Every structure is written in C-alpha cells, then in structure tokens.
Amino acid sequence: GVALGFRRLSIIDLSPAGHQPMASSGGRFIIAFNGEVYNHLELRAELLAAGAVPVWRGHSDTETLLAGFEHWGVEATLAKTVGMFAIALWDVRDRTLHLVRDRFGEKPLYYGWVGRGAGQAFVFGSELKALRALEGFANPVCREALAQYMRFMVVPAPRSIYQGIYKLEPGCLLSIKGASPQAAPAQPLRPSAVYESLTLSRWWSLADVVQA
C-alpha cells in the first residue's frame, strides 16, 4: 500500500479546495506537493485552449498540476512547469509512485528504506526529521557521508547523513511500479539506474539545455 501525508504551508488558495493530498478530477492521480508553480495560470490557459479543463474546484497550483498530468502526462507537464517543488504523485491506474524534484533542487526531497532485514519499508519526505519520526527508524549514521561532511561541511547528494536514506537529486524523477524494493541498494543510485521495480532518471538537465 501507499500512504501520503501532508502538512501544508498555504500560499496559493487558502481554502479547503487547496488541501492535500489532492486527487485529480479524473481520479487517476493523487498528489502531495511542496512548493509553488509560478506559471500555473498560463498552464490553466493552455489547458483551456486544448479543451482539457476539468471543473475547477479552486484556484491552487496543485490542482493545475494534476490537470496537466492527466492531459499531458507526467514528464511533459514537468517540462512546461516553472517553479520550485518536491512532488509525490501516486498513479492509481498504473500503480506507480513518482517522486520529483525541481530543476535546481530548491525544495528538498529524501527517500530511502526504514527497518531491518527483509521487508524494509520504502519511505520519503521533505525533511529528515519526518523520516526520523517514523516507527522503526533506526538507520545508523553513514560513514561515507560523515567523511564527506568532515571534508566539505556538507553531505553531497545523493547521500544523506543516514545509511539507506538518500537525497533525490535536482531535476530527477524516481518511479516505483508495483511493489517497492524491500531493501536499500548497496550504493546510492545515480540517474539512469534501475533497481528492481525502481527507476531513476533525469527529467531536466542543465547540460542538455546548454547543448541545445
């Protein structure tokens, strides 16, 4: 099963229509979204021109994202989106969980595995303290990350200070189709990696933009 929880700092649409987790009008997607989409009004206008406007429940950028995902698909919508965000998106139809981080990583997103032995739980959150609060969290400090911190005074992505917990890198999309892997990989995953039912890819790359 999949569980999404959200504690919202309301910026756009303070009404109950902006509450999260939020389901798309067609029921395919459920989202927990931290951040802001600066061009969401332009995206709404584009959806209107395409005849793909649902019955809007409010005026939140979250609802705009969901409408885009239903009409254009996940990666095509992300390519149109200007903003800062960390997204957890559950595709009900395809039984796929997507985790997304904005182009420059303005909003953090952590993921990893909690528990011991077989049957570890895959978890994710905007902050490490959210993961530390989970029942069964006993992940030790990662020695490699500690060494990096002592050298650079920061833990570079994709590692976090905890073993088995990683930072989703900027511009990346992590997808899990079906059951999640039940144990952390031996080494941090890099973009283009496939690990059992998990795939990690870049939906945006500065190098690609410069080359274009």
Where are these regions (language model features)?
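Cysteine-centered catalytic environments shared across enzyme families
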Residues: 1-212
